[in-house]
């Protein structure tokens, strides 16, 4: 299928940026999307048709009107694009997508069909509930009126609330309940069907449960649907089977079912569906159906009832059926489809199968022509934004901009360029009809500001002076000479894209504000399709093949997160499991929810795409992902949770509370040398965006001295790693080891600030303006065309325009022109927007400032904001200790629910919520009871005030949270943590309904104390953190004997020396641009070590490297310019004596 892939190697990109000769086919090298992605994008690129060899025989006209894709979730085995491609290969005139209870795959289906020029029909197979005795009609109407009004304001006349619920579609080989196959007759039919699917999903108030009312469906159709009698689960086939089982040759039940459909939907809106999968029983059944159709006066229509594209996918379809039923393939014997299979067939084959009834094939074609339409016709708009009297959207936006400009820029005469830019942007926004979009985003940002929620716009929105003036972004694009057209231009084929970063712990408030302001009917969150990846594919493949749960789990743990299943080597996973898992990989498994994407419509969203409940309370979610929404024209707003904003807010609060200092981020001195000196030492654990292995290797080489250096640093690591001796050409030029050169003097204007090396997407646009005379809007077209490869023809025209402009304006031709083009093409895919780097660089400085000046608050703020960032809480605490910050474990009389400060803000106290089995809610209750009634005096006192399970009480004791408690006899204190654990178990068993003293004895017998290693192991088990030590401390004597170099001393080791290092594995990382190289981060009590593992070494030690919690590594030191790493030659297991878990990344 024609979807884009990932980036090339770092070495290839570095060659291009350095201007060295090499490959001359950039189109083959640099796939990407030209978007705001840091390296390569997870954005789905537009579908591109690839050559298909059609069937080698004369075709009979045919249209397939009953087909399920993989978006029937475990009941279809082909991607929508695969169905379209096979339909094209078979010469079909049209194809319908009729997935179960949704339009999940319709956009991908429509995009592929548009590319191939095949007509599309849209429908769904509805899963009706099991029938139950119905109340009188009037009572049912009343019940429906009450049903969902509180939660979802759907059309009241089509309520479903009193209907029976559908049965779960998983866990059973043949889920009970009838199906109804509905085809939308054009755009209006689609709208009505979408609304009814949404109403059914929402009526039951629970994700995955549907509640269709057949009477409501009847009323909703209005002549805009066409009903096929469906598969064996349809009303007609079910009734027919009942008649045959009862020996009723007159088929009374089947005839009644068919006449009921006619009465409900009309004789011209029902067709009797015939299927034939190549078995004799199909002929007998079809003959009976044809006779029934003649009796009732209905046409017949042939379908394949396809659940996969071609015969080669039948094995995959059978496996998915077993997975859906939670059974093995052996256990599914008798339930699976006949050997012929439900796959697409050509018109010629269908004509042969239905030779006795040729009209059935012709009728399919005729109906497809009546129903087909282009999905793009449904594109909605934003709702009108409520503005004050006397204003429209344009005038109100202008008013807000002028107010903000006065604050940001002063009066017009003080900054004429800024006001000229604002006027230009307002004209473009008005021309494109987007003022409402900016007003919506401004409203969200204003809500956050009013409620004390940290937020900022980022990405290409920071190129806009309008966004800066009205407070959406905090980067001045006029002062920084950023191109507005990178964000918005007259030629743009869609609304702008503004990402808002909101502190993650309060993002839900902003989301609920949008629901409250626009109504749940007009706003919804965007879906995230959860697809099969390596581990889940292996687990489910093993399950389908009948292996035990333990074996499934063991094999899934052997799968790398970086490679496809098909590339796995060195495992003991059976070949048959790997083969099937590779076949499943990439298929959708279920729907999730996007991290922050929301859409807002001028009409009920369900008119465009069905909505359903998410797992999270209070969230409704579209059936489309962000790429689907963009393709159809839904206006999406990204409210992204950013953990660092939460952490910064916590840091500000902690410093105010414990040190009496009010920190205002915008007032910090961005020129403070001490902050840059700290970062130049790569002392950046926990600092936003510059804490990764690659960033920490770059900081000592770059040695940032001013704010713009941080802007560069944020962008510099994109798209890939600084590997081995390979140094970014910008750093070589910055440090004077390589001269600053330009391929042509005309490039100095665009590349001078970055020493002749393109780093930002805005630069490539400026390059096109300077060397070829492009307008800024044309330059953005070039960037986007290069980035997404949307149209080869468009790319060819722009390339010709670029070469012609270079020749005419500056006489640039030949090799120089090719080099300029190659740089443009390479960086169109991977360049970071400078506006984005500017936004993030501020957060780099703010977080670094806290680390330097308030290290305890910095640590506690990061702990409160978990999960976030690159490092685990254990590593964050270890780094705080290395900076002289004492860290104390959780204590029932000293801790809050979350981490806090003590001793004037100089020490950190861990929170109770981080203790195993406790969580935030219970921790808050423990703290509240202490605040209300005073400190706890014993374990029994605590369990008397706050009910705990035995597991919870014992986890608190294991964490040392009772260390400050003295019991009546002092036994808890004298016996140490073991005595507290004894007392905790006994106290937790005391209950109000039991007589005092009838439970186990709370006083512990004499118990031995715990060693320092045992205490650290207990801390790690209970909280994941050993606050007073690091696990390697207890092995140091043995490690010294072995000659292990502590991490903190590696900088002293000469480059090229062979060393032995060791520590806990905190990260495993294999960037897509690293050509298979894997990086490990080891940590000991003195610091961290970056370990480089070649492809060969990783293959040799794969099982150990992938699973070990700690390692000894022998290798060669690379020590240059303050950055040190070890190139591994040998790996060996290091036993810590306690748990440790790594964070693995791409």
Swiss-Prot record:
GO BP terms in the entry: DNA repair; DNA replication
Q: List every stretch annotated Disordered.
A: 1-43, 154-178
InterPro entries for this protein: DNA_pol3_alpha_NTPase_dom (IPR011708), DNA_pol3_finger (IPR040982), DnaE2 (IPR023073), DnaE2/DnaE/PolC (IPR004805), DNAPol_HHH (IPR029460), NA-bd_OB-fold (IPR012340), NA-bd_OB_tRNA (IPR004365), PHP_dom (IPR004013)
Q: Which residue ranges have biased composition labelled Basic and acidic residues? A: 12-26
Q: What EC identifiers does the entry list? A: 2.7.7.7
One cellular component GO annotation, for this chain's record? cytoplasm
Question: Its principal location?
Answer: cytoplasm
Q: Which Gene3D superfamilies match?
A: 1.10.150.870, Metal-dependent hydrolases (3.20.20.140), Nucleic acid-binding proteins (2.40.50.140)
Q: Where is the protein situated, by its record's location annotation?
A: Cytoplasm
Please list the GO terms describing molecular function. Answer: 3'-5' exonuclease activity; DNA-directed DNA polymerase activity; nucleic acid binding
Which reaction(s) does the protein catalyse, per the Swiss-Prot or TrEMBL entry?
DNA(n) + a 2'-deoxyribonucleoside 5'-triphosphate = DNA(n+1) + diphosphate
Q: Does the keyword DNA-binding apply?
A: no
- Alphabetical UniProt keywords: Cytoplasm, DNA damage, DNA repair, DNA replication, DNA-directed DNA polymerase, Nucleotidyltransferase, Transferase
Q: Which family does it belong to?
A: Belongs to the DNA polymerase type-C family. DnaE2 subfamily.
The record, for HAMAP family, names: DNApol_error_prone (MF_01902)
Q: Which PANTHER family match?
A: DNA POLYMERASE III SUBUNIT ALPHA, ERROR-PRONE DNA POLYMERASE
Its job: DNA polymerase involved in damage-induced mutagenesis and translesion synthesis (TLS). It is not the major replicative DNA polymerase.
Quote the protein name from its UniProt record: Error-prone DNA polymerase
Q: Which organism is it from?
A: Nocardia farcinica (strain IFM 10152)
Source lineage: Bacteria, Bacillati, Actinomycetota, Actinomycetes, Mycobacteriales
Gene (UniProt): dnaE2
């Amino acid at each position: 299928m024609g979807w884009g892939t990932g980036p090339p190697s770092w070495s290839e990109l570095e060659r291009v940026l350095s201007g060295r000769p090499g490959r001359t086919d950039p189109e083959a090298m640099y796939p990407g999307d030209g978007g705001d992605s840091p390296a390569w994008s997870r954005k789905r690129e537009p579908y591109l048709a690839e050559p298909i060899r059609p069937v080698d025989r004369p075709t009979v006209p045919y249209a397939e009107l009953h087909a399920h894709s993989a978006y029937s979730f475990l009941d279809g085995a082909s991607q929508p694009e695969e169905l379209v491609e096979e339909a094209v290969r078979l010469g079909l005139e049209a194809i319908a997508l009729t997935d179960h209870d949704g339009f999940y795959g319709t956009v991908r289906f429509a995009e592929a069909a548009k590319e191939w020029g095949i007509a599309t029909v849209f429908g769904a197979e509805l899963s009706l509930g099991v029938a139950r005795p119905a109340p009188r009609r009037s009572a049912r109407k009343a019940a429906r009126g009450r049903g969902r009004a509180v939660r979802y304001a759907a059309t009241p006349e089509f309520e479903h609330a009193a209907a029976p619920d559908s049965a779960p579609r998983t866990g059973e080989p043949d889920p009970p309940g009838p199906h109804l196959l509905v085809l939308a007759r054009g755009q209006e039919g689609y709208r009505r069907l979408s609304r009814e699917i949404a109403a059914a999903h929402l009526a039951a108030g629970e994700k995955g449960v549907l509640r269709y009312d057949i009477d409501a469906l009847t009323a909703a159709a209005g002549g805009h649907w066409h009903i096929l009698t469906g598969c064996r689960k349809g009303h007609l086939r079910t009734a027919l089977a009942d008649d045959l089982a009862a020996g009723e040759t007159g088929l009374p039940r089947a005839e009644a079912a068919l006449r009921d459909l006619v009465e409900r939907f009309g004789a011209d809106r029902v067709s009797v569906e015939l299927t034939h999968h190549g078995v004799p029983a199909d002929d007998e059944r079809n003959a009976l159906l044809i006779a029934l159709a003649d009796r009732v006066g209905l046409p017949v229509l042939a379908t394949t009832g396809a659940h996969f594209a071609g015969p080669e996918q039948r094995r995959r379809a059978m496996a998915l059926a077993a997975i859906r039923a939670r059974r093995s393939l052996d256990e599914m014997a008798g339930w699976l489809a006949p050997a012929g299979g439900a796959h697409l067939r050509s018109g010629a084959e269908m004509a042969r199968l239905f030779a006795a009834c040729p009209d059935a094939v012709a009728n399919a074609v005729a109906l497809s022509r009546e129903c087909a339409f282009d999905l793009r016709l449904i594109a909605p708009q934003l709702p009108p934004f409520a503005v004050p009297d006397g204003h429209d959207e344009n005038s109100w936006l202008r008013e807000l901009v002028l107010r903000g400009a006065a604050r940001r820029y002063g009066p017009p005469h003080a900054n004429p360029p800024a006001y000229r830019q604002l006027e230009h942007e307002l004209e473009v926004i008005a021309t494109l009809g987007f003022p409402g979009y900016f007003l919506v985003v401004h409203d969200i940002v204003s809500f956050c500001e009013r409620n004390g929620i940290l937020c900022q716009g980022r990405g290409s929105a920071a190129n806009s002076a309008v966004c800066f003036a009205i407070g959406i972004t905090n980067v001045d694009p006029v002062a920084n000479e950023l191109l507005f057209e990178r964000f918005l231009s007259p030629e743009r084929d869609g609304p702008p894209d503004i990402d808002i970063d909101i502190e993650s712990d309060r993002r839900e408030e902003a989301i609920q504000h949008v629901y409250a302001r626009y109504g749940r009917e007009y706003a919804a969150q965007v879906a995230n399709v959860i697809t099969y990846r390596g581990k889940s594919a292996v687990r489910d493949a093993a399950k389908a093949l009948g292996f035990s749960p333990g074996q499934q789990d063991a094999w899934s743990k052997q799968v790398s997160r970086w490679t496809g299943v098909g590339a796995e080597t060195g495992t003991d996973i059976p070949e048959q499991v790997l083969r099937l898992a590779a076949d499943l990989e990439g298929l959708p498994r279920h729907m999730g929810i996007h991290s922050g994407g929301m859409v807002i419509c001028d009409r009920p969203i369900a008119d465009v795409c069905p909505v359903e409940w998410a797992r999270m309370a209070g969230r409704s979610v579209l059936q489309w992902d962000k790429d689907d929404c963009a393709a159809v024209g839904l206006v999406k707003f990204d409210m992204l949770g950013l953990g660092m904003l939460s952490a910064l807010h916590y840091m500000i609060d902690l410093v105010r509370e414990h040190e009496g200092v009010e920190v205002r981020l915008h007032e910090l001195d961005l020129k403070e040398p001490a902050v840059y000196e700290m970062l130049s030492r790569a002392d950046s654990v926990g600092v936003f965006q510059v804490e990764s292995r690659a960033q920490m290797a770059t900081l000592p080489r770059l040695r940032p001295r001013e704010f713009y250096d941080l802007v560069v640093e944020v962008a510099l690591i994109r798209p890939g790693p600084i590997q081995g001796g390979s140094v970014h050409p910008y750093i070589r030029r910055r440090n004077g080891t390589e001269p600053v050169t330009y391929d042509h003097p005309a490039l100095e204007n665009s590349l001078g600030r970055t020493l002749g090396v393109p780093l930002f997407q805005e630069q490539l646009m400026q390059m096109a303006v300077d060397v070829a005379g492009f307008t800024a809007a044309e330059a953005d077209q070039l960037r986007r065309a290069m980035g997404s490869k949307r149209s080869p023809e468009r790319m060819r025209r722009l390339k010709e325009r670029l070469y012609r402009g270079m020749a005419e304006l500056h006489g640039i031709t030949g090799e120089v022109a090719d080099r300029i083009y190659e740089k443009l093409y390479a960086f169109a895919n991977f360049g970071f927007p400078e506006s984005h780097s500017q936004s993030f660089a501020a957060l780099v400085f703010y977080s670094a400032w806290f680390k330097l000046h308030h290290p305890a608050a910095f640590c506690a703020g990061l702990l409160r904001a978990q999960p976030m960032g690159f490092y685990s809480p254990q590593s964050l605490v270890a780094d705080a200790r290395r900076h002289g910050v004492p860290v104390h474990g959780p204590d029932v009389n000293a801790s809050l629910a979350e981490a806090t400060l003590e001793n004037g803000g100089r020490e950190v106290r861990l929170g109770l919520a981080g203790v195993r089995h406790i969580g935030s809610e219970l921790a808050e209750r423990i703290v509240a009871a202490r605040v209300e009634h005073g400190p706890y005096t014993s374990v029994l006192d605590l369990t008397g005030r706050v009910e705990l399970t035995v597991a919870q009480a014992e986890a608190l004791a294991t964490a040392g949270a009772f260390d400050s408690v003295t019991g009546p006899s002092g036994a808890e204190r004298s016996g140490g943590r073991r005595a507290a654990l004894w007392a905790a178990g006994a106290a937790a068993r005391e209950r109000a309904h039991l007589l005092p003293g009838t439970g186990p004895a709370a006083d512990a017998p004499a118990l031995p104390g715990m060693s320092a290693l045992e205490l650290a192991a207990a801390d790690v088990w209970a909280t994941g953190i050993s606050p007073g030590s690091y696990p390697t401390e207890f092995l140091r004597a043995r490690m010294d004997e072995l000659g292990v170099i502590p991490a903190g001393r590696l900088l002293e080791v000469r480059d090229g020396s062979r060393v032995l290092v060791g520590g806990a594995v905190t990260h495993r990382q294999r960037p897509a641009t690293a050509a298979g190289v894997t990086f490990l981060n080891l940590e000991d009590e003195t610091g961290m070590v970056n370990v480089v593992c070649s492809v060969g070494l990783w293959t040799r030690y794969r099982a150990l490297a992938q699973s070990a919690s700690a390692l000894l590594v022998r290798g060669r030191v690379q020590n240059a310019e303050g950055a040190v790493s070890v190139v591994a030659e040998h790996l060996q297991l290091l036993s810590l004596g306690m748990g440790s878990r790594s964070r693995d990344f791409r």
